[in-house]
């Protein structure tokens, strides 16, 4: 059966949209007051909930509680705050569409042009080792609903989901009190990514709770990743474009100082890094490795070369080598044919003698 596809809805096509009313509801209060003051300076009406409203009022800002705006109090211990037609209607209606404009006017709904929110700290709750019920209670419902409503209607509504976005938002407002479409579209993409990561974290955690045994593998595993770096190409030169992504919140163990590595280069780097790190930790000796096409052509330790090794490796005086240089010579000369054009890894800061042999 063919899927039913909803057609687009016609409305005003404007690049710059003035911010007249904003709804702020955040768990992370970083930068909140500064943003609130910037909005107030542009005569933006502020709507808010709970602790966010309290923080804004403490800074001397005038705020209307969402409950007062909707005429419906928060209920169920805060579980239901913003799930109301006056909130979602104000976010979702298409500006300039006659039917939508008539509907919101009849219902007494005011337009909401900016939504600033972040979600309950579910991941942090799990990381603390909280019990099942506490983790479930920290699954946000109203936040993701507003986030998706705002991001969907980004043609007219700006959605900010992180304090790191506030500076760019304030800069845009300071120009003319508006946000450009390019910013709204960019922030909407970030919002959908934020929502996807949030739901992926919950889904993976929940799947783990269903495991038959404590050490059993979960039946579902979802990951969210971000761009780490573009790559020269994939496995082979014709595989372009190519890029490396890393799980959100993680970092690479090293930096690329110059050049544009390909996919195999990065695999060599990651594997060689792990090998020399483990050798250094396990044996407490400088270590080196020579990698080619994700396989070690050789690995060496900083142990003084004997006479036969010096002859084989063409080393006149082994005492002239530092332990790290010795480790590199051992790794590189283990199979010099296979090491041709290799990726070299060393466990310590490269000294002059090691560099000479490299």
Question: Which role fits each region the language model picked out?
Answer:
Residues 114-137, 141-179:
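A short, charged helix-loop
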Residues 164-355:
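Active-site loops and adjacent core secondary-structure elements that bind or stabilize anionic groups
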Residues 48-57, 61-83, 295-298, 307-325, ...:
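Anionic-ligand anchoring segments at beta-strand to alpha-helix junctions in alpha/beta enzyme folds, i.e.
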Residues 13-20, 81-88, 122-130, 150-151, ...:
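Gly-rich Lys/Arg/Thr-decorated short loops/hinges at beta-loop-alpha junctions or inter-strand turns
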Residues 51-122:
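Glycine-rich nucleotide/cofactor/substrate-binding loop typically near the N-terminus or early
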Residues 2-69:
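N-terminal glycine-/serine-/threonine-rich phosphate-binding loop
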Residues 20-23, 44-45, 64, 88-91, ...:
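Structural motif
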């Amino acid at each position: 059966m063919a899927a039913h596809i909803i057609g687009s809805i016609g409305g005003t096509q404007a690049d710059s949209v003035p911010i007249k009313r904003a709804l702020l509801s955040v768990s992370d209060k970083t930068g909140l007051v500064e943003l609130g003051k910037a909005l107030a300076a542009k005569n933006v009406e502020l709507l808010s909930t709970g602790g966010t409203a309290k923080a804004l009022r403490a800074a001397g800002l005038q705020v209307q509680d969402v409950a007062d705006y909707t005429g419906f109090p928060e209920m169920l211990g805060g579980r239901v705050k913003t799930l109301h037609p006056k909130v979602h209607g104000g976010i979702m209606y298409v500006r300039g569409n006659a039917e939508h404009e008539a509907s919101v006017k009849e219902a007494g709904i005011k337009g909401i042009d900016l939504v600033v929110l972040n979600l309950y700290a579910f991941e942090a709750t799990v990381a603390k080792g909280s019990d099942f019920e506490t983790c479930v209670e920290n699954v946000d419902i109203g936040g993701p609903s507003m986030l998706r409503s705002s991001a969907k209607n980004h043609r007219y509504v700006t959605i900010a989901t992180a304090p790191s976005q506030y500076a760019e938002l304030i800069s845009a407002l300071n120009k003319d009190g508006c946000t450009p479409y390019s910013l709204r579209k960019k922030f909407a993409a970030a919002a959908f990514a934020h929502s996807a990561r949030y739901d992926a974290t919950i889904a993976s955690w929940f799947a783990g709770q269903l495991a038959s045994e404590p050490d059993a593998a979960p039946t579902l595993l979802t990951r969210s990743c971000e761009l780490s770096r573009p790559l020269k190409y994939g496995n082979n030169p014709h595989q372009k474009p190519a890029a490396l992504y890393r799980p959100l919140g993680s970092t690479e163990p090293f930096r690329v100082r110059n050049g544009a590595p390909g996919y195999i280069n990065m695999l060599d780097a990651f594997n060689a890094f792990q090998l020399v790190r483990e050798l250094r930790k396990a044996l407490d000796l400088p270590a080196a490795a020579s990698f080619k096409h994700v396989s070690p052509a050789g690995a060496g330790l900083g142990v003084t070369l004997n006479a036969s090794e010096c002859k084989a490796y063409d080393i006149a005086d082994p005492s002239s080598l530092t332990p790290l240089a010795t480790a590199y010579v051992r790794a590189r000369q283990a199979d010099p044919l296979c090491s041709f054009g290799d990726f070299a890894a060393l466990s310590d800061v490269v000294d002059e003698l090691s560099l000479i042999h490299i």
